């Protein structure tokens, strides 16, 4: 693929190649150092440090046209020089950015100074760069718009790594901007220098090291286009400090230079391909839909498709909410901790319609046995995913939304001819639902964590935006909260990054100020980014925290119980010297940040406690003490098959 810095420009309106899209990996855009051009007409000498370090005088606004046919009002005159940092911030404004999650440092100070001169961009100040990137993810996942995070060089930049990897695996549109040491110091092991472009090469869709201030408008435009087009993902822009300080007159009319990428973006699906899929549906007796994160933007079309066909829907962890979990045709989640009936449906299906999924190991278990009786149709926007893990019988590289629209038209036009009826199959699955419902046991006054989520679902009528950390609580939140719409469910699915839930809730609350946002968290995950309580308080965000506290690293402990004879290997998170006390005291963390908090230990008191949490204005933490013996069930052991499914037992049982 051509590099992003190719000399052959292509505009947004250029027609894509008429050829079939070639296989394309998200890793195929190499970074390059753009040579500094001789542009003395636009630049001021770097030596005038007195000018660079003085406040920038803002000229009267001048209207300029943007690419989106809206009038953008710049705070600078068209021919007025301004710092590279101000050009960067204005480039963000021109992309419609309203919020960034930025933590300052020496190499990014100029960017922060420029942000203070912006009247349209709000900075939500995290208390750790990882909190900032996870908050940007929460913003993006809940809104569908790209999330923006900014960090300084060195440790600030490396603190973004987990968030970038998470966004890459879960296809989240993210633009990360990092400060870098001045160009002359790059490669000298300067203070707080890390080669963040090299560090993040394999965990970003693309990244840039800006070597010419003139390139900032083009690079920012490309970064947003890359992050949001095709299969979304993170893009990193590394900006040396001297570039931020350099004075220049920006050229906002530069075209993007992405000819290779543009020519390989997927084409609209061919009608003949969609007709072939409809034919397979008409010939099947036991079809099932397997939908993932690639279907989140297609919920309306998916709903219509299910209405026209009557095919039951199983969802991945990423796909929760693309089809209402409370609908009778929903099988909820499939995979390792999916419902028995969802996994039964895949096991016994004769046609698997895989839309926007990647056949990952937590869904498939043993690949050879997964959907072994079924013909497989795979539709995905990333051709690298098709055939990567499971070879389909029919594949379409394209947008799931467009494919569903096309199939819906075919189905509507041929409804009388097709007369699809899968009633017998649906009855069989209904029997499985009755035989193997999601359930839990109650022991005395102890609070089952599943019950807490069930009550939250009832009291919020399934309308809350839910974020989670990673572990048992994450799986219970996936199972027992009935998501009605896409972008209600925010969770680190592919990477499984603990500490995600609290900052993600911050981003979701910023993006959706009128929504109920609840972080369902575990004590292990919560404490990994507990410092973000300060951000919640300072920003006065109405984030609710339902903390399922079992004093253990629950999911690892569950595996210890099942596969290691319950030998505890550093999974107890309390104080061994005071096992009868709750440690640490999460209420004191909340109190230190001025956030109301309460603890509940008895099942009979739980409903009222959750209602109080929801009714209290602003943020609130509810510490729900749960027994550590609970296991997430059902469970198919790693690498197992449907016949290996576990439906009984917990930490009170010996294995």
Curated annotation (Swiss-Prot):
Record region (Thiamine pyrophosphate binding): 472-552
Organism: Brassica napus (Rape)
A GO biological-process term: response to herbicide
Lineage top rank: taxon: Eukaryota
Chain intervals for the UniProt region annotation (Disordered): 1-24
Cofactor annotation: Mg(2+); thiamine diphosphate
Protein's UniProt keywords contain Metal-binding: yes
Cofactor note as given: Binds 1 Mg(2+) ion per subunit.
Name of this protein: Acetolactate synthase 1, chloroplastic
């Amino acid at each position: 693929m051509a590099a992003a810095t190719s000399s052959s420009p292509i505009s947004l309106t250029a027609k894509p190649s008429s050829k079939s899209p070639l296989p394309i990996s998200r890793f195929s855009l190499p970074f390059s150092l753009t040579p500094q051009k001789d542009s003395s007409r636009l630049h001021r000498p770097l030596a005038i440090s007195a000018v660079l370090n003085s406040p920038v005088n803002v000229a009267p606004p001048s209207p300029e046209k943007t690419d989106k046919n809206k009038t953008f009002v710049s705070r600078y005159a068209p021919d007025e020089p301004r710092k590279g940092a101000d050009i960067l911030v204005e480039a963000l404004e021109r992309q419609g950015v309203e919020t960034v999650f930025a933590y300052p440092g020496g190499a990014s100070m100029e960017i922060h100074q420029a942000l203070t001169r912006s009247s349209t961009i709000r900075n939500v100040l995290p208390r750790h760069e990882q909190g900032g990137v996870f908050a940007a993810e929460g913003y993006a996942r809940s809104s569908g718009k790209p999330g923006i995070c900014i960090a300084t060089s060195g440790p600030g930049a490396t603190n973004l790594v987990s968030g970038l990897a998470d966004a890459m695996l879960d296809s989240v549109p993210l633009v990360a901007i990092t400060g870098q040491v001045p160009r002359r110091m790059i490669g000298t092991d300067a203070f707080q220098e890390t080669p963040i472009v090299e560090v993040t090469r394999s965990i970003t869709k693309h990244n840039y090291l800006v070597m010419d201030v003139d390139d900032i408008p083009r690079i920012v435009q490309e970064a947003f286009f890359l992050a949001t087009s095709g299969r979304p993902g993170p893009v990193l822009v590394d900006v040396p400090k001297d570039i931020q300080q350099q004075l220049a007159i920006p050229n906002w009319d530069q075209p993007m230079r992405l000819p290779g990428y543009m020519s390989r973006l997927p084409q609209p699906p061919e009608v003949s391909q969609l007709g072939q899929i409809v034919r397979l549906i008409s010939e099947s007796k036991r079809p099932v839909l397997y939908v993932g994160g690639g279907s989140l933007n297609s919920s309306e079309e998916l709903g219509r498709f299910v209405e026209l066909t009557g095919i039951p829907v199983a969802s991945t962890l990423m796909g929760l909410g693309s089809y209402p979990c409370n609908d009778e045709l929903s099988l909820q989640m499939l995979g390792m901790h999916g419902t028995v009936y969802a996994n039964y449906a895949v096991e016994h299906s004769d046609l698997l319609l895989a839309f926007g999924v990647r056949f990952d190991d937590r869904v498939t278990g043993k690949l050879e046995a997964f959907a072994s009786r079924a013909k497989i149709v795979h539709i995905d926007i990333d051709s690298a995913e098709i055939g990567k893990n499971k070879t389909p019988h029919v594949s379409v590289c394209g947008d799931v939304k467009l494919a569903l629209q096309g199939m819906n038209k075919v189905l509507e036009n041929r409804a009388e001819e097709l007369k699809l009826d899968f009633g017998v199959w649906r009855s069989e699955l209904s029997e499985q639902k009755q035989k193997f419902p999601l359930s839990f046991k109650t022991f005395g006054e102890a609070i089952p964590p599943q019950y807490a989520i069930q009550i939250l679902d009832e009291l919020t009528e399934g309308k809350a935006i839910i974020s989670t950390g990673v572990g048992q609580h994450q799986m219970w939140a996936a199972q027992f909260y009935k998501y009605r719409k896409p972008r209600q469910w925010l969770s680190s699915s592919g990477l499984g990054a603990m500490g995600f839930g609290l900052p993600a809730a911050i981003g979701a609350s910023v993006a959706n100020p009128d929504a109920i946002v609840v972080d369902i968290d575990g004590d292990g995950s919560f404490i990994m980014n507990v410092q973000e309580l300060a951000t919640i308080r300072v920003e006065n965000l109405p984030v609710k925290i339902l903390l399922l506290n079992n004093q253990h690293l629950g999911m690892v402990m569950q595996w210890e119980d099942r596969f290691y004879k319950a030998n505890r290997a550093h999974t107890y998170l309390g104080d061994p010297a005071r096992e009868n006390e709750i440690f640490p005291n999460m209420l004191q963390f909340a109190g230190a940040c001025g956030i109301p908090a309460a603890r509940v230990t008895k099942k009979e008191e739980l409903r009222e406690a959750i209602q109080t949490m929801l009714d209290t204005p602003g943020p609130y933490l509810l510490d729900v003490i749960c027994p550590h013996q609970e296991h997430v069930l059902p469970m198919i052991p790693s690498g197992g098959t449907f016949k290996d499914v576990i439906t009984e037992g917990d930490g009170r049982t010996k294995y």
